[in-house]
Amino acid sequence: MNIFADFDARIKKTLQDIDLKQKDGGELDLSRIGVEPPRDASHGDIATNAAMLLSKAVGQNPRELAARIAEALKADEDVESVDVAGPGFINLRLKASYWQRELLVMLNEGTDFGRSRLGAGKKVNVEYVSANPTGPMHVGHCRGAVVGDVLANLLKFAGYDVVKEYYINDAGAQIDVLARSVMLRYREALGESIGEIPAGLYPGDYLVRVGQELAGEFGTKLLEMPEAEALAIVKDRTIDAMMAMIRADLDALNVHHDVFYSERKLHVDHARAIRNAINDLTLKGHVYKGKLPPPKGQLPEDWEDREQTLFRSTEVGDDIDRPLMKSDGSFTYFAGDVAYFKDKYDRGFNEMIYVLGADHGGYVKRLEAVARAVSDGKAKLTVLLCQLVKLFRNGEPVRMSKRAGEFITLRDVVDEVGRDPVRFMMLYRKNDAPLDFDFAKVTEQSKDNPVFYVQYASARCHSVFRQAADQLGLVDLDRVAMGSHFEKLTDESEIALVRKLAEYPRLIESAAIHQEPHRLAFYLYDLASSFHSQWNRGTENPDLRFIKVNDPDLSLARLGLVQVVSDVLTSGLTIIGADAPTEMH
């Protein structure tokens, strides 16, 4: 249960009970009242700005109104004390019995604790990675892959019906270049000396194997075909090979999409999907024939000093109108974006999230314009931009050669440090801030390495369970037994740990609402820190040890507390896509 939602309801009921009205006699708007943890934990457990928010409408001084509300809140059986602070904040401190009851709820819910109905089954499409199928995934793709995947997992846990989607950019000019590059490697595999890879083609050695496979399958047949026919075959085989490599890279990172959508699907049957999308916009009055003035600076590829078919995107929030069809009748890349959005919308998605690299910042307004025009303002579109990842080793930048074809791949990073450190650390800064990734730091066994610190807390929980088996003979811990003596948990440090656990449902909902999965990584680190601190208190003070052989009831209660810590760590790490280890060496 979200205790802050619980007290939000209680506070609003209290406001109704004291018959609080607007000074003109009307009903008060209580929807904007905030109920949250105080910034300083010493101030209490629950804070609300109700008095400050309502004082003007009520016509009463904020502190006087706060005192009136506080007096009424003292009647709540779970409230130990109520204080008014500053200009009119109301801080509530709750009784230990309330936290003990909440801990029992958490224990009974297990790893489902924190799961929310916030999304109410609403369909959400999360598109992420969508790397061009022209080579292996590089480290620059890694952050977007993790942010998108964890956000999708988070939204599912918050009750949304989520589809994870990958858009395969397999219809552009870069695919033609790729096919010609592989054709060269095919000829090389047949024994021809190809010399230096010509400028403009893909030089990567990863294409050698594709050429060899084509030589093994076709022999010299491709050389005997008309070039266009041979290139069509090479293109199909190469896209399949590249996507197999990309899927394998993503699998190594524990990223699994539900849908792989091919751009070429939009171009079948004379680009019927694109034509239909443009016709739909035309019927709505969003398309016209015209000429665009030349943009300042470098000219984009789709600008022509001729009449084109244009999208009135400025009428729906964009900076300039966008070309859909060139003067020669060919479609722009943007026209494909319109058709792809329409396809998603027609599949029943009213909410779509695009996770893109920071270099796609210029796409945001045009995509938002497409969403407004195609859906008549009914669809919600969000674009999350992921800033660059800078690689370090022992604090020194990792240099990547500028020579063509040389870069650090996603697989290189995962193979060196492991999947879990990569996933966790890619979340350890907000997506729109640059991130430093140090190979040495993420494998360090210290508090300064967040993923180690969190996973070590999980392992420590299980070491407590093993100690319980050795010292108390409790091999199979029973949740009913563990939850039957929570009234024995009275030490302030234990109650503080319960408070931290109780934040989890609110954290899940706020991270989902704001689409900020990094909040989960921060919370897990804070929870791990609280648990390690409690462990250390037991080391310093025998009375606070999790297991007291001479007091089995207290031991069971503390084991129940450890079990809930383990459950929340497991839940959060599962959403992140990392393991919750039972032991670490």
UniProtKB/Swiss-Prot annotation:
Motif, 'HIGH' region: chain positions: 131-141
Key words of the record: Aminoacyl-tRNA synthetase, ATP-binding, Cytoplasm, Ligase, Nucleotide-binding, Protein biosynthesis
Keyword Nucleotide-binding tagged: yes
One Pfam family recorded for the sequence: DALR_1
Location in or out of the cell: Cytoplasm
EC number assigned by the record: 6.1.1.19
One of the record's GO cellular component terms: cytoplasm
Biological processes per GO annotation: arginyl-tRNA aminoacylation
SUPFAM superfamilies, alphabetized: Anticodon-binding domain of a subclass of class I aminoacyl-tRNA synthetases, Arginyl-tRNA synthetase (ArgRS), N-terminal 'additional' domain, Nucleotidylyl transferase
Catalytic reaction list: tRNA(Arg) + L-arginine + ATP = L-arginyl-tRNA(Arg) + AMP + diphosphate
Source taxon at top rank: Bacteria
Assembly and interaction partners: Monomer.
Signal peptide range in chain numbering: none
Main enzyme class: ligase
Annotated organism of origin: Brucella suis (strain ATCC 23445 / NCTC 10510)
InterPro entries named in the record: aa-tRNA-synth_I_CS, Arg-tRNA-ligase, Arg-tRNA-synth_N, Arg-tRNA-synth_N_sf, ArgRS_core, DALR_anticod-bd, Rossmann-like_a/b/a_fold, tRNAsynth_Ia_anticodon-bd
Source taxonomy: Bacteria, Pseudomonadati, Pseudomonadota, Alphaproteobacteria, Hyphomicrobiales
Identification of the protein by name: Arginine--tRNA ligase
